[in-house]
Amino acid sequence: GALEELDDAIKAIGAHATIVEHDMGDFAALPRLAAAINQRWGRLDGLVANAATLGTLTPLSHLDPNVWDETISINLTAQWHLIKSMEPLLIAAPAGRAILVSSGAAHGSYPFWGPYAVSKAGLEAMGRVWAGETEQTNLRVNIINPGGTATNMRAIAFPGEDPNTLPSPDAIAPAFLQLLSDDCQEHGRLFQARNMLGL
């Protein structure tokens, strides 16, 4: 899988990584993960909150309540648990950086995208609140909209779209690296990855 490929790439340059599989619906595991990070490294230099589920594309009035609950749970509630668990480790770092990954759906009011759009709008609001709360620390929190990207989720949402017309995740990654760098002093802002990279 992709994580194993990343691990191989890291090893190829002489570094090492610890791969941890985690179900974002398992909220209780996040404090344990934070404790393990603290025990091994004592800090967290960067966090990218990218986990998401699309849910079902259907009118709000037809939506299965379980789909609503799951989408909000993974896309918003789990991210709050992540913030709660990881904030002390990020603040312990000399230049902790956090990125919350949003979507154009947070602003587009796309019909049939109800729980996904609502969860991403909520994520952006939470990111701004978190940035305000950490203003006086070394932590920098920002939000990024990658834009349409050739991912599995995009293929599910737009099955007729040619993925070759979209940037790959690798093409978008430099925008994330900018916001994760020690030099980044932006805080509490929403960035459009394509604009950052001139795509």
Label each PLM-derived region with a short phrase.
Residues 58-60, 64-69:
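Substrate-binding pocket helix/loop in short-chain dehydrogenase/reductase
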Residues 50-56:
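Conserved NAD(P)H cofactor-binding loop of Rossmann-fold oxidoreductase domains
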Residues 136-139, 143-144, 151, 160-199:
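C-terminal helical subdomain
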Residues 45-46, 69, 96-101, 139-142:
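Conserved catalytic-site loops of classical short-chain dehydrogenases/reductases
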Residues 83-84, 128:
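A short, exposed helix-loop element centered on a Lys and neighboring polar residues
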Residues 53, 91, 97-122, 127-136, ...:
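Catalytic loop of short-chain dehydrogenase/reductase
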Residues 20-32, 65:
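The beta1-alpha1 cofactor-binding region of Rossmann-like NAD(H)/NADP(H)-dependent oxidoreductases
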